[in-house]
Amino acid sequence: MSTICAGGQTLESKYGGRAPPQIQLPDRQWPSKKLTESPIWLSTDLRDGNQALPNPMTTSQKWQMFRLLVDIGFKQIEVSFPCASDTEYTFTRALVETPGAVPDDVSLEVMTPCRKETLVRAVESLKGAKKAILFTYLATSDNYRETILQRSEAETLEHVRDCIEYARAITKEDPEARQTEWSLGFGMEDFANARPDAALRLAEVIQAAWQPSRENPVILGLASSVEAATVNIFADQVEYFSRHLSSRETVCISIHTHNDRGGAAAAAELACLAGGDRVEGCLFGNGERAGNLDLVTAAMNCFTQGMETGLDFSNLPEIRRVYESITQLPVHPRTPYSGDYYFRAFSGAHQDAIRKGLQKRAANSSKSPWKVPYLPLDPADLGVSFDNVIGVNSQSGKGGVAWLIQNGLALSIPTQLAASFSHVVKEQSVAQERGLAAEEICALFADRYDLRDSPSGRVVREHGYIAAFQHPGCALELEDVTEQAARAAGILTRGLDFLLRCTRAASHPLGGPDDSNLTVAFVQCAVTEKAEEAWGIGIGFSQDSAIDRALLSVMNRHYQPTPIRAPLATNDSVIPRPEPIRGG
């Protein structure tokens, strides 16, 4: 049974004929190639990006965006559509005329329709610039040409020849304009749906009219204006075009992809394998409809393959903050590289794998290739804190909890303690009906194990015995005690409703700059009379004092005031000492 679409058409009759013209390329080369260097990057945030905003940028916001793009490292920036409004034209002139605004190695690009009167306006906006790209465009596919231009192919070719010759005359052949280094770009609108032979004929006309050179090639923009096919088809189209151009060495092929099917980044990458030299896009994928190519994604894909990109995203959170402030568009939390959740693992298995991977890397002095499971790159390379790597919810496990405690409190807790505390975290997450932030988990840990203040007790050790225990409402302090006095303190256990037996202990020095003389101890105790296990944590100036405080931490949580009736038992010790430290 055929699906019936809106308007009563069948699925096949409505969408079945949209496939681009078939290209016969049995010897295609791009599938066996590998990217080894980054393409030229063109930012069109101030043009394509700006026109797609519900509220286009003000002049001050344009200046802010331009400075951001320069700081990132873009060398080609499309800044305006001068014939659209006086605001666009004036902004371009301000860039040219403001001393020091445009670095000498940055080319200003403006876009304009392929008409003589608009070409003049665009050239006037750029006069005096050190490096300028005059970029014009025209529909290339039969559908766009017939629907929008209502011209034959022959009429279109003649129109383009006339306009490009005119552009050459008013730029690089004009004595007054020669102080600017002019380049020409021509965008083939809807190239992805154009007949290959028609696109090549247009390219030959443009080359003949502009007369490019190896040193100053003409830029031919191949646009997937509305993504309508799989990315391999676009790659075939680009390779066919590249291989059949005459004077290929005088042409820079520029790739302009859109994200209508979600394939902008993949289409651009495969197009570069197929012959693309430059890619066009916007920060975070801004642009009409589903957006243009996300330049952050494209650049970081190269970066994570070991390629120099020339772009600096080492403080990506700040770049994103400025971008969101200017555009009022939020970056989706799942956006590659830049989203809040890009690095974040909620799965317990993933968290444990990340923790182990980072420990292995640290053990290798952090000089080995990056191979941490589930982390595509080091968050620090984007200026992202490791606090953002682990997200804890009711699905998380002990590995993530241990990682957050280590990062937030500098405590390397034993695996068994992490497992025990993870149940507490899960209960809290379920109760709150949300995930818990790292700060909340650290606070919960500190509260549960008496880490906010010293344990509510005082310990004086003599010959390995705990000699005092204190709790609100029940206190005993013995100072300068002898071994006999310490044994006499056995009355405490007779006054409690439980007895502790230490079953596991571990410790490590604290690693902070102010903690060089401190040790933290983790003690697991069997709580008799209650048939349960409990953990205590203590910090002291020695391993013994840290263990004492850890034991007090356990006693404080389990103490229930009861009348003390037992007689003094001089041969009893309060708490059996733990086994030797065995680690976590």
Curated annotation (Swiss-Prot):
Keywords: Transferase. Residues 39-317 form the Pyruvate carboxyltransferase domain. It is an enzyme of class 2 (transferase). It catalyses: 3-methyl-2-oxobutanoate + acetyl-CoA + H2O = (2S)-2-isopropylmalate + CoA + H(+). Its EC number is 2.3.3.13. Disruption phenotype: Impairs the production of echinocandin B and the ability to inhibit the growth of C.albicans under screening conditions. Signal peptide: none annotated. GO terms for molecular function: 2-isopropylmalate synthase activity. InterPro entries: AIPM/Hcit_synth_CS, Aldolase_TIM, LeuA-like_post-cat, LeuA_allosteric_dom_sf, PYR_CT. Due to their effectiveness as antifungal agents, echinocandin derivatives can be used for the treatment of human invasive candidiasis. Pathway: Antifungal biosynthesis. GO terms for biological process: L-leucine biosynthetic process. The keyword Zinc does not apply. It comes from the Eukaryota. One of its GO terms (cellular component) is mitochondrion. NCBIfam families: PRK03739.1. Isopropyl malate synthase; part of the gene cluster that mediates the de novo generation of L-homotyrosine from acetyl-CoA and 4-hydroxyphenyl-pyruvate. L-homotyrosine is a building block of echinocandin B, a fungal lipidated cyclic hexapeptide that acts as an antifungal agent. This is followed by isomerization of 2-(4-hydroxy-benzyl)-malate to 3-(4-hydroxybenzyl)-malate by htyD. Belongs to the alpha-IPM synthase/homocitrate synthase family. LeuA type 2 subfamily. PANTHER family: 2-ISOPROPYLMALATE SYNTHASE (PTHR46911:SF1), PTHR46911. This is Isopropyl malate synthase htyA. It comes from Aspergillus rugulosus.
